Amino acid sequence: MNKGKYIFLDVDGVLNHHETYKKKHVNSLYPDLDPECLALFSKLVHSIDYVHIVLSSSWRLIESDMDRLEAAFKEFGIPKWIDITPYLEYEQGKTRGKEINQWLKENHVRKDQIIILDDNTDMADLKNRLIQTDFMNGGFKEVHLKKALHMLKGNHMTKETKEIFEALEAANNTLDNLYKALNALDSAKSWSIADILGGGFLMTYMKRSRVKEAQVYIDNRKASIEKFAKELHDVNEDINISLDTGEFIKFADYFFDGILVDWYVQSNITTAQTQVSNAISRVEHIKELLLHKLNGASVQ
């Protein structure tokens, strides 16, 4: 069993994420798994010859969980895992990394033959083989796929390559907040128009709710853009994005009622939409530059 490449697979935070549970009705066959994550994982396993899956997730401990996972794998053309990692008791110093190390020892597999897909970091001396995903931010994404392919093909992870992957992950986090903000603003604008046309209390409430939601995502993007800028600095890129939407969007028409204030709020929602859309375009362009840089090409 010591030939080929091995993927040690966690499930929660890799093949699903916190948004998955809001969409359970979409697919009742595997409501705890995300179709987009499964599709990307399928792409990964079919892009590498002689690759094997070893299940390291806590799902391996519950038969019904494994049955659901196997059914989802079958639908997405993913081969079933060849084995599961051993379960270590807490008195044995149980960590995910130690369980994987135990499996490697028992099966005579080298560390450079493996990658680990997991949202946890308790990997002991295997952290350099970890591709860490994020349960709160989409699980297994395109950037993780690219990193996994890079490692499984035996490419050396240089400092520059590592920094590019980190910048790409930061770009994805930033885009996630920006797209959520834009969706909330789009909804707020629709409710705002209805409110101006005399929609009543419900329309006003829904408008305010969506504006508040957008403000949360806009506030969140501040931290993600700061991290993105830092990662870009590490790869000699630059970014300059301004999203000054202002607190007035939150509360202006809470205390004042009238057509002038309603139009003022509507105007500022439109301004915020434009700012967020421009920021998305800028980040998407920089992401494209990073991907070309990763592939050894350049974009003017």
Which residue stretches match the model-derived regions?
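C-terminal cap/substrate-recognition subdomain and adjoining C-terminal extension
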Residues: 67-156
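Amphipathic alpha-helical coiled-coil segments
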Residues: 161-178, 182-185, 214, 218-221, ...
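Alpha-helical coiled-coil oligomerization motifs
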Residues: 176-179, 183-186, 190-193, 197, ...
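A short acidic (Asp/Glu
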Residues: 18-20, 64-69, 125-128, 206-207
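Short, basic/hydrophobic alpha-helical segments
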Residues: 38-49, 102-110, 199
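Long, low-complexity or tandemly repetitive, helically biased scaffold regions used
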Residues: 190-212, 216, 226-274
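Substrate-recognition element of Asp-dependent hydrolases with the DxDx(T/V) motif
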Residues: 48-66
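Active-site neighborhood of HAD-like aspartate-dependent phosphohydrolases
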Residues: 2-47
